[in-house]
Amino acid sequence: MSAGYKIGYQVMYRLGITPWVHGEPPEPLAALIEGPRSLPPGDMLDIGCGTGQDAIYAARRGWNVTGLDVVPRALEQARRNARAAGVAVRFLHGDIARAGRGELDANYTLLLDGGCLHGLAPDQLRRAAATLTDAAKPGAVLLMLAFAPGRRGPAPRGIDPAQVPGLFPQWDLAFSRPATDIDLRGPVRNASPSWYQLVRR
């Protein structure tokens, strides 16, 4: 992640401007955790975990969760939230775009990106995708939220749907669909977010 984006997120957390924090888990995540075709609990990686609401949701339902974020203030709040919820989550300070291949555990069966990768520059995005691929067990599921590409000032640059197969050549795309469950406002209200679900070969 670029220094500018990191500073931007740090400032927003400091000011309490966190529109990505939600009360309920996103519908596609809830389907994977609790739906009729849910995954058996295992190891989960939540990149850009923020204050930990999705990580805590999964941990309450038996998952062994690691949350990764670049903003220390967000991680401090995430740890407090986990303690208050009575669950154990491993929260790590780090940048998925700078993590070396092999630095993360290689046993994750569920990987969640609730809006991290779509803010990365192309070279960072390729590195992050390779790191996630290395961290996933065969059969693992990656759930990714991404805006459509476009210039929105300081907002995330987005991901072209046509890019996804090239970024994740060792994955099969299970579905992509509009993220109608996400309420966007302000400069990103027309960002046309989509959910992508991929399965590791």
Where are these regions (language model features)?
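Class I (Rossmann-like) S-adenosyl-L-methionine-dependent methyltransferase catalytic domain
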Residues: 1-45, 50-106, 120-135, 140-201
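Conserved acidic residues
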Residues: 109
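A conserved beta-strand element that flanks and buttresses the S-adenosyl-L-methionine
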Residues: 112
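Short catalytic micro-motifs in class I SAM-dependent methyltransferases
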Residues: 115, 119
